Amino acid sequence: MTIDNSKKTSFGFRQVNEKDKAEMVGDVFDSVADNYDLMNDLMSFGIHRLWKKITVETAGLREDFKILDLAGGTGDMVKLMRSKISNQGSIILSDINWSMLHEGRNRLIDEGIEDVQMAQIDAQYLPFKENTFDLITIAFGLRNVTNKKTALELSLTHI
């Protein structure tokens, strides 16, 4: 009998090895990127849009904010936040999954929002200097991060 000493983390309703989760999550989002918002609408009866709107309205955004949206996927949070900041501010849409980031970029461009930077990054490994941002958001993407504590602690060092 072999003993599995690898660290476990949640993936849906089951526990998986931490080292396997990122690839599993990637496979899921590669397959759903173009229908992701529709899936969220169906699963939450559209309430996710209200939650995101309330989040943006209560975030205390200023015109000059520098914002990083982690696990930003299709860009719906970025779209809401972009209207609240001026050209003095900036937003980076980021996601670990290229398919989601590509979908987000296309949707933002279709909406006439072309001044948002894009970055394919993992929320657990931020490639920015500390204290770079005024606000870091991560909507529902936190559920897909392998080590949530690491990602949240790291985010705090970058605000």
Where are these regions (language model features)?
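Conserved small/polar residues in nucleotide/adenosyl-binding loops
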Residues: T157-I159
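A short acidic, Gly/Pro-enriched loop at the edge of an enzyme's catalytic core
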Residues: Q124-I136
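Class I SAM-dependent methyltransferase SAM/SAH-binding core
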Residues: K66-L126
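A short, conserved alpha-helix within the catalytic core of class I
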Residues: V145-L154
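Hydrophobic beta-strand segment of the Class I
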Residues: Y36, I136-T137
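Conserved alpha-helix/loop element of class I SAM-dependent methyltransferases that forms part
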Residues: N35-L38, F45-F65, L80
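Short catalytic micro-motifs in class I SAM-dependent methyltransferases
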Residues: F140-R143
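N-terminal auxiliary segments of SAM/dcSAM-dependent transferases
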Residues: M1-G26
